[in-house]
């Protein structure tokens, strides 16, 4: 099993950290969509992505590609920034 060290010294499974990161990403996208007053269908049309895929993404049942994230961000007038941290 692969573990990573957290800032507080705690060790957690890499798989758990990946799930946490994906959920945080989903939450940020969902928050922006709602702030803009867009439905999932409207966002999908703007991004060229089907509404069911937006729903799957927002429910956490979809592991999105970077291209998917960039399309949705662009449809909301946002940019994607990827950072790597120790």
For the regions a language model picked out, list residue spans one by one:
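Short basic helix-loop element that most often maps to the first helix and adjoining turn
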Residues: 27-45, 71
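DNA major-groove recognition helix of helix-turn-helix/homeodomain DNA-binding modules
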Residues: 67-82
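Residues in the helix-turn-helix
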Residues: 42, 53, 68
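N-terminal flexible/basic segments that precede or flank functional cores
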Residues: 1-28
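Recognition helix of helix-turn-helix/homeodomain-like DNA-binding domains
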Residues: 47-63
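Short amphipathic helical patch at the helix-1/turn junction of helix-turn-helix
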Residues: 23, 34-35, 63
